[in-house]
Structure formats: structure tokens, C-alpha cells
A protein has these predicted regions:
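Short loop/turn motifs at secondary-structure junctions
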Residues: 4-5, 23, 89-91, 115
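Catalytic nucleophile-loop/oxyanion-hole region of alpha/beta-hydrolase
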Residues: 65-77, 129-130
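A structural alpha-helix within SAM-dependent methyltransferase catalytic domains
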Residues: 48, 82, 110-113
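Conserved hydrolase catalytic core segment
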Residues: 91-130
């Protein structure tokens, strides 16, 4: 199993912890709430033979810093994801987001579509987007 490269990427007043391993197109894995980069460790090890797999601790979570006194927005977190894509790769990525991470992936696709080659959204809490039943 490949040993991940661990680093912190500075973005807008935060130090975002990320780890990446493997070679190939960038595959950014965005975790949900109450998780961190470690959530994807097993999957990252398996996928690293085909991709450069990147996972990270979202702003103000686990090993990442940030100003907890300021409201965090999905837009801010999408900019954090974009900064990681730019720092580790060539400005484009396949993105997989789970739960709250899926919302970040959707925001990234809506506001910076040029950064996304493909987006997989898993368990996105988007109930407000559904029609009234």
C-alpha cells in the first residue's frame, strides 16, 4: 500500500491538512461531517494504482485549522477544495463527495465547473431541493 504524502495547504486564513497517494488523474475525496481524511484511507489505498487520490480534513476539522468564530459557508469550503486541487494537481479533478462533502462537490461544480472532470455525489442532504410531497 502506498504511503500517503501528508501536507498542509494554506487557503484564506486556514491550513488545510491533506494527504495524497498514487499516480494518475486527481481524484478528490470530500468527507462528510464528523469525519476526516482518514475516512477514505482504505479506498484511497485501493484506488491509488489508477489515480492520485487526495483526501483532506475540512476547514476547522481534525488536523485543519481555521477561524471557528466565523460562519463557514459551503462556498468557502468549495474554495478550499479548489485550492487543494490546484496545489496537488493541474487544476482539474474527479470529485467524490459524501453527505456534507457532496454539497461541497455540488457547489464546486456550480461555481467552478472548469475544475471538475466528473462528480459523484453520495448521500447529499439536499431535501430542500425536492418538491413538496
Amino acid at each position: 500500500m502506498p504511503t500517503p504524502i501528508r501536507e498542509k495547504i494554506s487557503n484564506e486564513g486556514a491550513e488545510i491538512y491533506c494527504e495524497h497517494r498514487g499516480n494518475g488523474p486527481i481524484l478528490l475525496l470530500v468527507h462528510g461531517g464528523m469525519e476526516d481524511a482518514g475516512y477514505y484511507s482504505s479506498a484511497a489505498d485501493i484506488l491509488a494504482d489508477k489515480f492520485t487520490v487526495v483526501s483532506y480534513d475540512r476547514r476547522c476539522n481534525s488536523r485543519s485549522s481555521g477561524d471557528r468564530s466565523v460562519d463557514m459557508t459551503v462556498t468557502q469550503q468549495a474554495r478550499d477544495a479548489a485550492s487543494i486541487i490546484n496545489a496537488v494537481g493541474d487544476g482539474k479533478a474527479l470529485v467524490v463527495g459524501r453527505s456534507g462533502g457532496a454539497i461541497i462537490g455540488l457547489e464546486l461544480a456550480a461555481t467552478m465547473p472548469e475544475m471538475i472532470n466528473f462528480l459523484i455525489v453520495h448521500e447529499a442532504p439536499v431535501i430542500e431541493l425536492l418538491p413538496q410531497i
